[in-house]
UniProtKB/Swiss-Prot annotation:
Belongs to the leguminous lectin family. It comes from the Eukaryota. It comes from Cladrastis kentukea. One of its GO terms (molecular function) is carbohydrate binding. Homotetramer. Glycans are attached at residues 119, 147, 152. This is Lectin-related protein.
Length: 290
């Protein structure tokens, strides 16, 4: 991969209160913008079978508990060689070539990764944006998103991964990473995965500041993990994308886990705003990271 073209990231572990303050700041920043050109918003507090708003790929299904079960479970146990994805059915207008404007977005979701053996976990789950016709890719460490670890701008994929297995292109520990057109993350932060516990994720993109922030919090321990990146969506994604989740289990027997999404909300707003508003928003975004 061309590391020189990849964004700088802030990686840290912060108390829950700090993450909450940052999250609220960015959420309000997005919602208080004016001159909206297009907006898309949806919320799933639970999921139901045959839901028109969802496109399920691979092994993904809605469980009897109303959860998005991305990888296969047989007789109560996760199995290897499984990959599944779930996407929102309506494409998102993420940027406009006629005006040059780029959408801001915020998404929040809860998920659980549970493994029978804490010493044999694989492979992880990701939230991603990709072209509307995106299909399942390779399983295992590629998380159903890519077929190679080589950076390729034609992939047109932006993802935030929650990775439980160390592949050859990964750091040596479980981690959170931001992926730009490659499964080899641009930067990573160590993730203290907690087996079977609910994680709360907030991912925000503030277009005027070209800033992407991802945070994961375990309420049970008030432990949080944060990544921040400068990301130019126009250089990565097509104008229209689909958003969703992808997950995969390991290729070897025993290296398995469940990947269940419990709830999900998403809001995007494509703005026309003036330059002064953009400067003010960019300043606020920068200030929130100090």
């Amino acid at each position: 991969a061309n590391s020189n073209s990849r964004p700088h990231l802030l990686q840290t572990q912060k108390p829950f209160s700090v993450v909450l303050a940052i999250s609220i700041t960015f959420y309000l920043l997005l919602l208080n913008k004016v001159n909206s050109e297009e907006a898309l918003s949806f919320t799933f507090t639970k999921f139901v079978s045959n839901q028109d708003e969802l496109l399920l790929q691979g092994d993904a299904l809605v469980s009897s508990k109303g959860e998005l079960q991305l990888t296969r479970v047989e007789n109560g146990q996760p199995i290897p060689h499984s990959v599944g994805r779930a996407l929102y059915s309506d494409p998102v207008h993420i940027w406009d070539s006629s005006t040059g404007s780029v959408a801001s977005f915020v998404t929040s979701f809860t998920f659980v990764v549970e493994a029978p053996n804490e010493n044999k976990t694989a492979d992880g789950i990701a939230f991603f944006l990709a072209p509307p016709d995106t299909q399942v890719q390779s399983l295992g460490g590629f998380l159903g998103l890519f077929n190679s670890s080589v950076y390729n701008s034609s992939n047109q994929i932006l993802a935030v991964e929650f990775d439980t297995f160390s592949n050859s292109w990964d750091p040596t520990a479980r981690h959170i990473g931001i992926d730009v057109n490659s499964i080899e993350s641009t930067r990573t932060a160590t993730w203290g995965w907690r087996n079977g516990e609910v994680a709360i994720v907030l991912i925000t993109y503030v277009a005027p500041a070209e800033t992407l922030i991802a945070s994961l919090t375990y309420p049970s321990s008030q432990t949080s993990y944060i990544l921040s990146a400068a990301v130019d969506l126009k250089s990565i994604l097509p104008e229209w994308v689909r958003v969703g989740f992808s997950a995969a289990t390991g290729r070897s027997a025993g290296y398995v886990e469940t990947h269940d999404v419990l709830s999900w909300s998403f809001t995007s707003t494509l703005e026309t705003g003036n330059s002064g508003a953009k400067q003010n928003n960019a300043h606020l975004a920068s200030y929130a990271l100090i």
